[in-house]
Structures are given as C-alpha cells and as structure tokens.
A protein has these predicted regions:
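Conserved, structured core segments of small domains
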Residues: 1-93
C-alpha cells in the first residue's frame, strides 16, 4: 500500500542551527529507508520547511513507526500528515 507523508519542520520550537546539526544523520537515515524500499520518492516542499514522501508500507502504523526513526522525528522536530493512497479508478478498465 502507498502513502503520502507530508512533513513540517517545527521551526517555531527549534532553531536553524538545531536542524543543521542533525542534517547528516537525517540524510543517512532517509537513504537507508530509501534503500530498503520504504521511501519511494522524496521532495522538499516549496510552500513551507518540510518534505513530501511517497511511502510503501503495509499500514499507517508502520509508516509512523519507520518515519519515527528519522533523527528530526526522534527529536520532536517534525510534524507528519499521513495520507493513505489508492489506485486512480480512471486508469482501470
């Protein structure tokens, strides 16, 4: 099953320096999740500080569990919106 995960950096509670110091670990963990097929695609958001991820997982619980292993998430620096996706019916016969 696929999910869209929208993240928002909690910039009202954390400084840019606090985010910057964790970037190498965040990137490393995101690469590991990508390598195992959990993260399918990832983009930076253009509207606010955060990211948009296309995720492959069995359940929303699993999505939250694995995203919770990101260093920003472990530090409480992110908010997540998780949207379950289903196939577009317009492309079905």
């Amino acid at each position: 099953m696929q999910f869209l995960a929208l993240t928002r950096r909690r910039t009202e509670n954390f400084s840019e320096a606090e985010f910057t110091s964790r970037v190498p670990a965040e990137v490393g963990r995101a690469r590991a999740l990508y390598a195992e097929g959990f993260i399918r695609q990832v983009w930076h958001r253009a509207d606010i500080a955060g990211a948009c991820l296309l995720i492959e997982a069995d359940s929303e619980e699993r999505v939250r569990e694995k995203l919770g292993t990101l260093p920003f998430a472990e530090a409480g620096m992110l908010e997540f919106t998780i949207v379950p996706l289903k196939p577009y019916a317009g492309f079905c016969p």
